Amino acid sequence: MEQKYDVIVVGAGHAGVEAGLASARKGAKTLMLTINLDSVAFMPCNPSVGGPAKGIVVREIDALGGQMAKTIDKTHIQMRMLNTGKGPAVRALRAQADKVLYQQEMKSVIEAQDNLDIMQGMVERLIIEDGKVLGVETVIGTTYLADAVVLTTGTFLRGEIILGNIKYSSGPNHQMPSIKLADHLREIGFDIVRFKTGTPPRVNSDSIDYSKTEIQPGDDLPRAFSYETTEFIMDQLPCWLTYTNGETHQVIDDNLHLSAMYSGMIKGTGPRYCPSIEDKFVRFNDKPRHQIFLEPEGRNTKEVYVQGLSTSLPEHVQLQMLKTIPGLEKADMMRAGYAIEYDAIVPTQLWPTLETKKIQGLYTAGQINGTSGYEEAAGQGLMAGINAAAKVLGHDELILGRHEAYIGVLIDDLVTKGTNEPYRLLTSRAEHRLLLRHDNADLRLTEIGYNAGLIDEFRYSRFNNKKAAISEEINRLSQIRIKPNEKTQSMIESRGGTPLKDGILAIDLLRRPEMDYASVVALIEEQGMIDESVQEQVEIQTKYEGYIQKSLQQVEKVKRMENKKIPENIDYDDIHSLATEAREKLKEVKPLSIAQASRISGVNPADISILLIYIEQGKIKRVN
């Protein structure tokens, strides 16, 4: 039995659903294959979406025409804006998800999508001929043909769950692992690494004494990830904060020899920025306590996620540890935490489109590329789906620059630098983070999403109207002069500012740190009716104009380097002046531009100068 598609997506987690939807929405006939249809967009770890950097990725996914933002807006139990006391570059939205509702909503979306077929089945091998992918074969012998395949296998590849001294084959949440496909990828020559992640225990809400914890409510203001959301969930559930203590740490110390992390049973590299409680105890032994957040997993379940207590200690030790924590003395553990090891490919084997260098038409996205996190997976899935469909349909491929999106930073880091541990996106990884803000994702990316075929005409028209409104309001404030009358002076002094000596343009008054848009406009006779999102942009663009201009100047310098393309047929062995390490790294990564080459670890400025001279002199030796 054979069926033919344009694009096949293997897996239906957070990367898979975005890849499948993007491909189908671009007009490619798409098939999504998944081990279990009941686990579409499942959240095996924390029941949340967003946070620092990650929340901005969710906004970017939405601006490009992806799905994650819309789904979490419909299914969250709480939403909070983080870092509101800091500058706009680090503000980010975070939502607690109703994980079951999130799954159900996402499954409904993919089931209703035109051009997208969904099938339960386990892929065991790729069909490859002359270095090009032709399709996939399942464990029951069914063959599906396609011109492009996107692998979004998550932590299922040779997945193994570890709990104390027990280790067994399993995908996340004790699902069936993918063994044969993992072996197949090794057989066809991919470099594979072994990574590890983990999850904490879940406890019954009725067994928690919340009076001993600190309430963590959601924001009172309506919040949303998607620019299209108009209905907001105001009936929110709180989370709760408690702490470990000396007694907790004593239980860990007494049983550290039983932890798979320290017994030698776990061989995979774990995530630096999401350590287990054992790891935190060992690495930060001077800390008297560690934060523990109690997060409801949904509105219709008693399960509470014990965030901060990820562990691979035996089940009885986990329960003993829980009972030392204030509020959890009588905790009823419903699920034990565990560690999971899995295979991932070395991501420098990918082009920036997420197509593999080894096999034409084969793309990978999500944790198979060495990342951690639902948001990082979804962003990659979206880009892989766009590019797989573009390849088949003859459209232009899409590569986002580091100055355009956190998704661009993420993918460039992976394919240029690689990673020796599960990669987590951080604001500190973005050198242009003032340009990559939560508030301006639509201004950065909606045009790109429209050109890629994922943004409809109605939304694109609204976006253009918003852009025009921002420009018009900045121009208006640049022409209105505010007099130093009693009302003006009183307003400025009440906000801790220095009184005016003379009249001032409204736009210049807005630049003062103590003034905001509302207070400036209150001093103008013709106030106008301006949308809140437009007000926000006018204020940020005005107050941070100098810093933004500096960032844009830096971007222009980088763009000049990006425009210096490295010919595909370059032979690095022919450039004798290159350092040996630089030559090896350049041959491995195969950078597309001088800028990308300069970001490779082990390639220094002297090597870049040599490479530039070689290219500019036209000394390109064709590779046989």
From Swiss-Prot:
Q: What is its main location?
A: cytoplasm
Q: Which Pfam families match?
A: GIDA (PF01134), GIDA_C_1st (PF21680), SAM_GIDA_C (PF13932)
| Gene Ontology BP terms | tRNA methylation; tRNA wobble uridine modification
> Which PROSITE patterns does UniProt cross-reference here?
GIDA_1, GIDA_2
User: Where is it located?
Assistant: Cytoplasm
- Keyword field: Cytoplasm, FAD, Flavoprotein, NAD, tRNA processing
Q: Where does NAD(+) bind?
A: 270-284
Family as reported in the entry's similarity comment: Belongs to the MnmG family.
Assembly? Homodimer. Heterotetramer of two MnmE and two MnmG subunits.
Designated name of the protein:
tRNA uridine 5-carboxymethylaminomethyl modification enzyme MnmG
Question: What is the organism field in this record?
Answer: Macrococcus caseolyticus (strain JCSC5402) (Macrococcoides caseolyticum)
